[in-house]
Structure formats: C-alpha cells, structure tokens
Amino acid sequence: MLTSTFNTTKSEEIFAAAQKLMPGGVNSPVRAFKSVGGNPIVFDRVEGAYVWDVDGNQYIDYVGSWGPAICGHAHPEVIKALHAALDKGTSFGAPCLLENVLAEMVIDGVPSIEMVRFVNSGTEACMAILRLMRAYTGREKIIKFEGCYHGHADMFLVKAGSGVATLGLPDSPGVPKSVTANTLTAPFNDLEAVKALFADHPDQIAGVILEPVVGNAGFIPPDGGFLAGLREITQEQGALLVFDEVMTGFRIAYGGAQEKFGVLPDLTTLGKIIGGGLPVGAYGGRREIMSLVAPAGPMYQAGTLSGNPLAMTAGIKTLELIRQTGTYEYLDQITAKLINGLLTIAREAGHQVCGGHISGMFGLFFTAGPVHNYEDAKKSDLAKFSAFHRGMLEQGVYLAPSQFEAGFTSLAHTEADIDRTLEAARVVLNQL
C-alpha cells in the first residue's frame, strides 16, 4: 500500500506553502492534524475505498470525505451522471427537474419528511432549521447536547464537540454572549437534565436539536429509550424535536436514525450522502411547519447555489445505488468485523478500549468506557489515540485525525481491506 519507505516530502512542502495562503493551511480545522500531531497528508486522488497522497502513498480510507462516500469514492456511475450533467451547465439559479427528483427521493426515504428545502451545507440547514423552530413556536430558546455539532453558526457554538465546557459561554471568539444566551445545553443520554431545563424555562423553549447518534464527539449511540423519551417530553411541552441527520441520514439506514430507532422528529436536517460528494444540505419535516418557509410563508431563507444541478445529480445517483437490497446489511457486516477486530486486538495488546458501530458508522475510544456522553468521551487517552493514528497512517490506513470524530465504511470496502486494516492495527497496537 505504501512506497518502500513512508515518505511525505511533497505533502510537507505543499502544506508549508498552504499555511502562508490559508489560515492554518486548511479550509476546515480538523484537516490540519492538530489533534493527532504531525502535518496532514495532501491528497492527490481517490477511488473506491482508497486514497492516494501526492507522494504516491496509498491508504485504505475510513473517513470517506467525512461521510458522503457511502458508495466509495468516485463511483463510476456517479461520475458518469456528473459528466452528462456538466454538458448542460454547472449552475442554473432557477428551478430544474432534478430538484423534484431528489426531493421525492428524500421524502420517500425519510419517514418524517413531507416537504424539503435544499441548501448548500449542513451548517446552512441547521441555521435555517433553528429559525424555523422559532418561527413556528414563537419561542426563542433551544436545547442542544454537549458534544453534538450542528455546524459553525454562532448559536450552536456552545459545548460543541471539543468546545470549552463553560455554562452558556461561546466556544469561539467573535460569538456574542447574547447570541448563545438562548442556547441551553444538556448531557447526551440524560433525559432528567432535559426535563429540568424545561422546568426552569417554562413556555420558552422552541425545541430540542440533537445528533441522534453522536458522530462529532466520537461515536456515541443513544441509550435505549432516550430518543423516545425526548419525543415524549417535547410533545408534552409543545416544543419541536429536531434530528440533525447530516451524518446519520441514509448512513445508518436508508431512512436514517429515525427509521433505525423508530422515533419520528418534527424536523430533520440532512447533508453529506444526499449530495454524493458535492456540497449540499437540506432540511425538511411536517408540511404544516415547512409551509412557513419563504416564498410559501414568512420565514426567509435563500441561496444562490441551492438545488444546483450537479449536487442534485450526484445525490440522485447515490441514493439510487444505496437503496438497492443488501446495502445496509453489507455495511453492518464489514463494519462489525472491523470494530470488533480492533477492540479484540487492542485488548490483547493490553489497552483499555471501547467502541461500537451502527451499520457503516463506527468509533473507538482509548478508555474502558462505556461512553454515554461527551464527558465520558473526554476520558479517552488522547496521546495514545494520536500515536495509534500516526502508526496506522504509516501502515497505509487513513483514520479520522481526531478522537472526537466517527469513522465510516463504504460499499467499496472489501473483506480483504478489513483484514489488511486489522493486520496493520495488530502491528501498531503491539508497539504502543
């Protein structure tokens, strides 16, 4: 998989130049490898389950562009569809049939969505859905969960992922306290904390938003009854329940977490997979609520590139591919083999670890666990994870460069890829 010696000379040169051109040398912070040390490798191309860097090193990829590459990178049918779409233009700024097609697929696939609006990113979708929550309820406060990430909009940068654990204070300079004052936080998987917030702020909370399976504090699944409990509480309080399924939508089941767990939210955000690797986001829900969105209603939201034909094309083809029989069974099979193998090898090597998976989404923590929330996740041995990440990179395996990010498999990953990954892990974990 690698060249005879692990050489990243070209990556180092390109990244050094990038740091003079872009803040930190990247266009999204996690890419800079700050959490794991060293400098990032610079990609040259991707295909299937593999990525190649500019030095010619090949890696088995478990990041998948942070989730969209569920079919594998550069799937030939997606590429073919995009070539045909390019011949018609890159952006219309006007209605096109492709929007209808993808909208129908999303509505058919996601149980709670009756109407949908396309945007250009998950952050945009979450920004819009917060405005919609407030417009519909006439209330201003929201509840989010520690470690859940809903994009980089001001109102969500409170205890977001690896943010500062302070009460009601923003996790980034430049975010006014007045903006985050209406953002209430609770520990994930803690229904009593949610009930207490509603009791402390009667008739003031517009809704509860969460990643139904946390992926931005590492992989943290919901405890049994947690999602159903939130549904019950919000209905009792006249508040909305919002699932941020940017990561889990079409990933852990075709209908996302709401299909997997049988709990229907009022509103849902989507992204990643529905764009097939191109920039996209969406939000949707009950017709009654979505009818407030302009121009049907008074809640304004717009976007120059929203619904652009290239993203719609890639999304349509991707959903066509993954709705075929056996997709999620296969993802579950190979991901179970991967995470169970990693856990076994790590424990045999004397490390305290825990982890798990749902379909093609997984995570591993260097702590005995269990991990139920962000505070539990922070008990992970970050130095050990960093060494593990670097060792796996040198063995030709590309993992997310942060302990606080979930990993992903794809339909392009084979049993042989998993075997090679576990062989690499055995070498690395026995050396830590």
Swiss-Prot record:
Coiled coil: none annotated. It comes from Cyanothece sp. (strain PCC 7425 / ATCC 29141). It is found in: Cytoplasm. Belongs to the class-III pyridoxal-phosphate-dependent aminotransferase family. HemL subfamily. Homodimer. One of its GO terms (cellular component) is cytoplasm. PROSITE patterns: AA_TRANSFER_CLASS_3. The gene is hemL. The modification N6-(pyridoxal phosphate)lysine is found at K272. It catalyses: (S)-4-amino-5-oxopentanoate = 5-aminolevulinate. NCBIfam families: hemL, PRK00062.1. The keyword Transport does not apply. GO terms for molecular function: glutamate-1-semialdehyde 2,1-aminomutase activity; pyridoxal phosphate binding; transaminase activity. Pfam families: Aminotran_3 (PF00202). Its EC number is 5.4.3.8. InterPro entries: 4pyrrol_synth_GluAld_NH2Trfase, Aminotrans_3, Aminotrans_3_PPA_site, PyrdxlP-dep_Trfase, PyrdxlP-dep_Trfase_major, PyrdxlP-dep_Trfase_small. GO terms for biological process: chlorophyll biosynthetic process; protoporphyrinogen IX biosynthetic process. Its cofactor is pyridoxal 5'-phosphate. Keywords: Chlorophyll biosynthesis, Cytoplasm, Isomerase, Porphyrin biosynthesis, Pyridoxal phosphate. This is Glutamate-1-semialdehyde 2,1-aminomutase. Pathway: Porphyrin-containing compound metabolism; protoporphyrin-IX biosynthesis; 5-aminolevulinate from L-glutamyl-tRNA(Glu): step 2/2; Porphyrin-containing compound metabolism; chlorophyll biosynthesis.
